[in-house]
């Protein structure tokens, strides 16, 4: 199912997107967001996340940077290069 959804997104980006123009107010674009969400979270949850994102993308929204949230457990895992005994450095970026 995941491969079918990704193929449909690829067809949309190649066949329809050039004719519709860039209308997305977010970065990454809604189609890129959908692809990333499906890859990271699977077909069902990724499709739900993409549908919610499409509902947020309208002319009255501010838009801005809105990446796909990380899967549970990956954000808190320390990097492999972290020194033993020292906590990893966490960088928090301001929300747009």
Swiss-Prot record:
Transmembrane segment boundaries: none
Protein name, entry field: Putative membrane protein insertion efficiency factor
Short name of any one Pfam family annotated for the protein: YidD
UniProt membrane topology term: Peripheral membrane protein
Low complexity composition-biased segments: 71-84
Keyword Cytoplasm assigned: no
Cited SMART domains: Haemolytic
Chief subcellular location: membrane
Keywords: Cell inner membrane, Cell membrane, Membrane
Subcellular location: Cell inner membrane
InterPro entries: Membr_insert_effic_factor_YidD
NCBIfam families: membrane protein insertion efficiency factor YidD (TIGR00278)
GO cellular component, one term: plasma membrane
Family statement: Belongs to the UPF0161 family.
